[in-house]
Curated annotation (Swiss-Prot):
Catalyzes the rearrangement of 1-deoxy-D-xylulose 5-phosphate (DXP) to produce the thiazole phosphate moiety of thiamine. Sulfur is provided by the thiocarboxylate moiety of the carrier protein ThiS. In vitro, sulfur can be provided by H(2)S. Its EC number is 2.8.1.10. This is Thiazole synthase. It comes from Geobacillus thermodenitrificans (strain NG80-2). 1-deoxy-D-xylulose 5-phosphate binds at G157, A183, G184, N205, T206. It comes from the Bacteria. It is an enzyme of class 2 (transferase). One of its GO terms (biological process) is thiamine diphosphate biosynthetic process. Pathway: Cofactor biosynthesis; thiamine diphosphate biosynthesis. Belongs to the ThiG family. Keywords: Cytoplasm, Schiff base, Thiamine biosynthesis, Transferase. The active site is at K96 (schiff-base intermediate with dxp). Coiled coil: none annotated.
């Protein structure tokens, strides 16, 4: 089970809801993924305009926990304002803190992220900050009281996969809260690797919404994350420099 704050989830896949070809495809992909946590950008949602269509109308919200994010924020203060807006909607008490420090790379601003997380924790939010693969920053965020840390595998939407598995492994080793790999996942192999490293979950969006067949890719990601977690729990064999026969010669009869 994936435990975030007071909540428990069977699925370790967190799915973004943006950039799908249509609301119908989005709905099918969400269902195929088996995800129980759905994230969305508050600034792109018409949560206070019921006359305008949005993905919430397509879903049975009793099956999902919503994770609004503060995408578009450049400062801690902006992130806090967006989070308060999401909370005022009555849909959720979790927030993914996203404070971007560079428009070209969409990498997070570490100083503003830390500041926003602290402010939101003081207001009683369940805080999940998007961060880089900076090992020290991840530790600072968990020490602050964040309910999970979400290090990026590579830049948002780049599909480059896990660029620095060593840093991610360091973050996971020191973690006292769930580690959810976020951003840059391109295909099922990337998701498997994240889980084999020991991550507690994976958040992805473009890898599914941008696929030629989003519904099939959503199912593939579901299976990849399950396989990666099983592999991690099973314990892979150590790598060796030389071969080791699976059928040793000892005890074999001479023909």
């Amino acid at each position: 089970m994936l435990k975030i704050g007071p909540y428990e989830f069977s699925s370790r896949l967190l799915l973004g809801t943006g950039k799908y070809p249509s609301l119908d495809v989005q709905k099918e992909a969400v269902e195929a993924s088996g995800a129980e946590i759905l994230t969305f950008a508050v600034r792109r949602m018409n949560i206070f305009s019921p006359e305008q269509p949005n993905f919430l109308e397509q879903l049975d919200l009793s099956k999902y926990k919503l994770l609004p994010n503060t995408a578009g924020a450049k400062t801690a203060e902006e992130a806090v304002r967006i989070a308060r807006l999401a909370k005022a909607s009555g849909l959720c008490d979790m927030i993914k803190v996203e404070v971007i420090g560079c428009d070209k790379t969409l990498l997070p601003d570490p100083v503003e992220t830390l500041k926003a997380a602290e402010m939101l924790l003081e207001e009683g939010f369940i805080v999940l900050p998007y961060t880089s693969d900076d090992v020290v920053l991840a530790r600072r965020l968990q020490e602050l009281g964040c309910h999970a840390v979400m290090p990026g595998a590579s830049p948002i939407g780049s599909g480059q996969g896990i660029i620095n598995p060593l840093n991610l492994s360091f973050i996971i080793e020191q973690a006292t809260v769930p580690v959810i790999v976020d951003a840059g996942i391109g295909g099922p192999a990337d998701a498997v690797l994240a889980m084999e490293l020991g991550a507690d979950g994976v958040l992805l969006n473009t890898a599914v919404s941008g696929a030629a067949d989003p519904v099939k890719m959503a199912k593939a990601m579901k299976l990849a994350i399950e396989a990666g977690r099983l592999g991690y729990e099973a314990g892979r064999i150590p790598k060796k420099r030389y071969a080791s026969a699976s059928s040793p010669m000892e005890g074999m009869s001479v023909v």
